[in-house]
Amino acid sequence: MENFQKVEKIGEGTYGVVYKAKNKLTGEVVALKKIRLDTETEGVPSTAIREISLLKELNHPNIVKLLDVIHTENKLYLVFEFLHQDLKKFMDASALTGIPLPLIKSYLFQLLQGLAFCHSHRVLHRDLKPQNLLINADGSIKLADFGLARAFGVPVRTYTHEVVTLWYRAPEILLGCKYYSTAVDIWSLGCIFAEMVTRRALFPGDSEIDQLFRIFRTLGTPDEVVWPGVTSMPDYKPSFPKWARQDFSKVVPPLDEDGRSLLSQMLHYDPNKRISAKAALAHPFFQDVTKPVPHLRL
């Protein structure tokens, strides 16, 4: 740790404080995440160390690179490449004008490339949200915190007792499914896609039941026809109100037919029928994809 000089605190992640830091030996600027675990007393679980070490092998231009894992005195520090801004801050800064569609398309395409890569290595994210999608001035966007959920679990609250957001959580997780798949990440990315387009969160729930009901009000309450097996999921209740599905042209008005088609496939209730990242990359929506540069106010 003595090799790093902390420059400033960037923010509070799910698991601990994140600092901008400088490697004293190389001059490289990095993001330093201190992982606060409940098991501080017993030290860091060896399973977590093993999981995290595997992530050093995940090399892809749309994945934030884990440069190093430093394990000292019951504390764990993760050293990541440094990026300028997260998508949440960028969306907030672009709230008046909106993000131009070519940039939205580029971001979605790049994120799907990152997902396809991780999913092909059987690594899930499980907690995708605009805060852990990081952007650079050159038009790149990268997925951060990949694999941390499996190593440390997804807590209900962060170490500072902030509630971990449910807005991007897939319905199978909300309905208590214990065994979920890569499809949970596609759902989250679909919600983020819609948010970039409309400039507001698609399903901003404030509790698990509110989250589910917001999804149901938009996509219709699922039944055995659209989602075989849904009625036997642990948290499914036959007493759920029966809402009808809304037309997607009302849900994401700025999107063209290709965009709506892709979004509806990313938000398919049945995880087995939800489009994969690899298939999404071949969708007609991306036939004219480019890589524009964002106007960053840093």
From Swiss-Prot:
Active site per database record: 127
Cofactor(s) listed in the protein's UniProt record: Mg(2+)
UniProt cross-references to Pfam families, sorted A to Z: Pkinase
Positions carrying N6-acetyllysine: 6
UniProt subcellular location: Cytoplasm, Cytoskeleton, Microtubule organizing center, Centrosome; Nucleus, Cajal body; Cytoplasm; Endosome
UniProt feature coiled coil, ranges: none
Record keyword Cell inner membrane present: no
Record-linked SMART domains: S_TKc
MF (Gene Ontology): ATP binding; cyclin binding; cyclin-dependent protein kinase activity; cyclin-dependent protein serine/threonine kinase activity; kinase activity; metal ion binding; protein serine kinase activity
Subunit structure of this chain's protein: Found in a complex with CABLES1, CCNA1 and CCNE1. Interacts with CABLES1. Interacts with UHRF2. Part of a complex consisting of UHRF2, CDK2 and CCNE1. Interacts with the Speedy/Ringo proteins SPDYA and SPDYC. Interaction with SPDYA promotes kinase activation via a conformation change that alleviates obstruction of the substrate-binding cleft by the T-loop. Found in a complex with both SPDYA and CDKN1B/KIP1. Binds to RB1 and CDK7.
Post-translational modification, as annotated: Phosphorylated at Thr-160 by CDK7 in a CAK complex. Phosphorylation at Thr-160 promotes kinase activity, whereas phosphorylation at Tyr-15 by WEE1 reduces slightly kinase activity. Phosphorylated on Thr-14 and Tyr-15 during S and G2 phases before being dephosphorylated by CDC25A. Nitrosylated after treatment with nitric oxide (DETA-NO).
Cofactor remark from the record: Binds 2 Mg(2+) ions.
Enzyme category, top tier: transferase
Binding site for ATP: 10-18, 33, 81-83, 86, 129-132, 145
InterPro entries assigned to the protein according to its UniProt record, in alphabetical order: CDK (IPR050108), Kinase-like_dom_sf (IPR011009), Prot_kinase_dom (IPR000719), Protein_kinase_ATP_BS (IPR017441), Ser/Thr_kinase_AS (IPR008271)
Binding locations of Mg(2+): 132, 145
Keyword ATP-binding: yes
Modified residues (Phosphothreonine): 14, 160
The name this protein goes by in its record: Cyclin-dependent kinase 2
Site annotation CDK7 binding: residues: 9, 88-89, 166
Gene3D superfamilies: Phosphorylase Kinase, domain 1, Transferase(Phosphotransferase) domain 1
One BP term from GO: DNA repair
Regulation (activators, inhibitors): Phosphorylation at Thr-14 or Tyr-15 inactivates the enzyme, while phosphorylation at Thr-160 activates it. Stimulated by MYC. Inactivated by CDKN1A (p21).
Residues recorded as bearing Phosphotyrosine in the entry: 15, 19
Role noted for this protein: Serine/threonine-protein kinase involved in the control of the cell cycle; essential for meiosis, but dispensable for mitosis. Phosphorylates CABLES1, CTNNB1, CDK2AP2, ERCC6, NBN, USP37, p53/TP53, NPM1, CDK7, RB1, BRCA2, MYC, NPAT, EZH2. Triggers duplication of centrosomes and DNA.
